[in-house]
Design a protein with these regions (language model features):
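Short, contiguous alpha-helical
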Residues: 7-24, 29-72, 112-163
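Helix-adjacent hinge/juxtasegments
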Residues: 63-103
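N-terminal beta-strand motif that seeds the catalytic metal site of vicinal oxygen chelate
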Residues: 1-2, 8
C-alpha cells in the first residue's frame, strides 16, 4: 500500500506551523485571549503546549535530555515558534537516520498528565505530529469564533505537499 510518508506529514505540519507563526506575528493580541482548550488558560498556553509536546517527543526520539515543561512558560511567541522549527528538524533528523529496528523499538517515559507510557518510536513520531494538528484545529475554530479568522486554508488538500 502506498500512502503518505512521514516526511510528507512532517512537511505538512511544518508548513502549517509556519503559517501560524506568520499569522500570530500579524495578530499578536490573539495570543492573550482566554480559552479552555486542553485545560489551558489562554491561547499562548495552547501554543506552548503544542510546541512543548512536539519538542519533548523529538528529544526522546533522539535520546536528548528532556526539556522541562516549566522552563518554556516564559517564552515569547517568536521563541516558541523557533523551538517548533527546531523540533521539526529534530524529528526529521530522527526519521532520516532511523532504521526499521529504531522505528519498532519502544520507549517508556513519564508524561505530565497520563502517568508512564510505553510506545514504539513510530507511534511517538506520529503522535508528536498529529497532536499538533488536533490542537491547531481546535485553536483555529476558537480563534474564528472570537473574530480572528486565519488567512489560509488549513486542509491538507490545499497544502503544497504532494500533488
Amino acid at each position: 500500500m502506498r500512502g503518505l510518508s512521514f516526511g510528507e506529514l512532517l512537511d505538512y505540519t511544518s508548513d502549517e506551523t509556519n503559517h501560524w507563526r506568520d499569522w500570530f506575528t500579524k495578530n499578536p493580541k490573539a495570543m492573550d485571549l482566554p480559552c479552555d482548550i486542553a485545560g489551558m488558560k489562554d491561547v499562548r498556553e495552547v501554543v506552548l503546549h503544542i510546541v512543548a509536546v512536539q519538542m519533548r517527543y523529538a528529544e526522546r526520539l533522539l535520546n536528548l535530555p528532556i526539556t522541562e515543561y516549566d522552563e518554556l512558560g516564559s517564552k515569547s511567541a517568536t521563541e516558541l515558534f523557533t523551538l517548533a522549527h527546531k523540533s521539526a528538524e529534530d524529528l526529521r533528523s530522527f526519521a532520516v537516520a532511523a532504521n526499521d529496528a529504531d522505528w519498532d523499538g519502544t520507549l517508556t517515559f513519564p508524561t505530565r498528565t497520563a502517568g508512564t507510557l510505553t510506545a514504539s518510536r513510530r507511534k511517538i513520531f506520529v503522535h508528536a505530529l498529529l497532536h499538533g494538528v488536533r490542537h491547531w484545529a481546535q485553536l483555529a475554530t476558537f480563534l474564528r469564533q472570537q473574530g480572528f479568522k486565519q488567512d489560509w486554508p488549513h486542509d491538507f488538500i490545499f497544502s503544497g505537499v504532494i500533488k
